[in-house]
From Swiss-Prot:
PTM summary: Exists in 4 different forms, depending on hydroxylations. Tx1a-PP does not contain hydroxyproline, tx1a-OP has one hydroxyproline at position 45, tx1a-PO has one hydroxyproline at position 46, and tx1a-PP has two hydroxyprolines at positions 45 and 46.
Upper lineage: Eukaryota, Metazoa, Spiralia, Lophotrochozoa, Mollusca
Protein name per Swiss-Prot or TrEMBL: Alpha-conotoxin TxIA
PTM sites of type 4-hydroxyproline: 45-46
Species per Swiss-Prot/TrEMBL record: Conus textile (Cloth-of-gold cone)
Pfam families assigned: Toxin_8 (PF07365)
Residues making up the propeptide: 17-39
InterPro entries: Conotoxin_a-typ
Protein origin, superkingdom: Eukaryota
One Gene Ontology term, aspect cellular component: host cell postsynaptic membrane
Length: 56
């Protein structure tokens, strides 16, 4: 029974850790998009070509 408890705790910790890292990546991408937009990057074709994932 104790082994099952440890497995559940470990699985919960792994899921929590990976979902936290995914949300951090999303925040970084949003911050990059805001920075590019403020600088006017997404209105210039060469910049759009260099950042297609951010300028969409």
């Amino acid at each position: 029974m104790f082994t099952v408890f440890l497995l559940v705790v470990l699985a919960t910790a792994v899921v929590s850790f990976t979902s936290d890292r995914a949300s951090d990546d999303g925040k970084a991408a949003a911050s990059d998009l805001i920075t590019l937009t403020i600088k006017g990057c997404c209105s210039r074709p060469p910049c759009i070509a260099n950042n297609p994932d951010l300028c969409g």
